[in-house]
């Protein structure tokens, strides 16, 4: 699961199915940039400003606002919660790692075109308008605060089937 496990609604079921498929000693690995603990204080500040600016652009330019629904990508799990689900499904965690990555403006703008990200960040907003507001807001925030990049932490977990 390359940066997708957070999109799965029933993580326990998926891990159970993977466990049923693997033999003892088999490896299940995944990563995610959306987990409890993924945002540093700097990243949180950027993200709040980015989302608030996006909302303002959506309202002012398109007369739109997102729905209040909470989608799967916004229901983040902690390392401990992932570990518990894995252990409940006959896995032993052999490695967890958090890797800090400096993401330039282009990276934030690129993700602004990704449908699953938009559904999490601005649920219910049409893709075209959501993308335009996210891209423009990111550029404005980077410019305003003279940013060259913003850190994002990536979680990687490797587990062994018992």
Where are these predicted regions, by residue range?
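A short glycine-rich, Lys/Arg-flanked "PGG" loop and its adjoining helix->strand segment in the class I
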Residues: 12-27
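Conserved class I S-adenosyl-L-methionine
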Residues: 27-59
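C-terminal helical/coil "lid" or tail adjacent to the Rossmann-like core of SAM-dependent
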Residues: 93-148
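Short glycine/proline- and acidic residue-enriched helix-loop micro-motifs
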Residues: 63-69
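Short alpha-helix
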Residues: 73-90
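Core SAM-dependent methyltransferase catalytic element
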Residues: 90-91, 112-114, 151-162
